[in-house]
Amino acid sequence: MMEKQQDTGVPELARAEYIKVESNVRLHITDAGDGRPVVLIHGWPLSDEMFEYQYNALIEKGFRVIGITLRGFGKSDKPYGEYNYDIHALDIRRILSKLEITDAVLAGFSMGGAIAIRFASLDSGSHVSKLALVGAAAPSWTQRKGFPYNLPKSAVDDLIKLNYTDRPKLLSNFAKIFSATETSLNDGISSWLNGICLSASSYATAQCLIALRDTDLRSDLAKIQIPTVIMHGNKDKICSFDLAEQMKAGISNSYIVPFENSGHSLFLEETQKFNAELIKFAGK
């Protein structure tokens, strides 16, 4: 079921594999270190490679880190079909089951945070015992009745249209608002992130924008009973800080760690603080 793809010379510490979640769909994972599992779910339209500066920090502190690249992105297979949060949550469950993961900390960034909420609301506690929501696009990324926060749906409609006519421009526009200011991240980091984003399929990029636009997770929040940390940039232009406050109000056993100097990319803008907070939470 699993095919070894990379020989790092230290197989007991670093494993890069493909895991089959359906008969014709394999997802790429990075599985490194030993200890309590920390499972990382990337945001739109990135891959598990975005966590490069988290892997080493977590491994050094004695954690096993499992980065899952969602279908349609990065090195994972890119099938046509559904890309809703239920599909992604099921993929994650299948991977954690095959790896026999228990007592894990599930950390999701942006769209990955929204998917992590859906997963945690359905999980019986067999796999995950803590939840970290990082700049999460939740409980709703778009405005709706009784929820006047973040983007209007029409703005996402425009993003979907641009994806099909000029995807590089879509990603360039996205990069301009990814951090607190356009110069918060250096050119090298921005170029690296852009390369990861371009590795996604155009179809998955659009389908996940539809999921981001249409999914309302407000009813999921009350179902989450595990300890939850909400890490969010005060200057986030993609997922406004209002969303963090709404998640805090809806998840009973949760608290917010604000990142005063960060936009959406808090894991890169305040890397040391981010890693320290995640390690502290995972080690409790």
Residue spans for each PLM region:
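Alpha/beta-hydrolase fold catalytic core
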Residues: 1-38, 60-63, 101-102, 133, ...
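Conserved HGGG/HGGXW glycine-rich cap/lid loop of the alpha/beta-hydrolase fold
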Residues: 25-81, 238
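Conserved acidic catalytic loop of the alpha/beta-hydrolase fold
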Residues: 87-104
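Gly/Ala-rich beta-loop-alpha elbow adjacent to hydrolase catalytic centers
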Residues: 108, 112, 116
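Flexible "cap/lid" loop of the alpha/beta hydrolase fold
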Residues: 117-122, 126-165
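Conserved alpha/beta-hydrolase catalytic His-Asp/Glu region
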Residues: 142, 146-151, 161-222
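Short beta-strand/loop motif that positions the catalytic acidic residue
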Residues: 224, 230-232
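Catalytic active-site module of serine/aspartate enzymes centered on a nucleophile-bearing elbow/loop
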Residues: 254-284
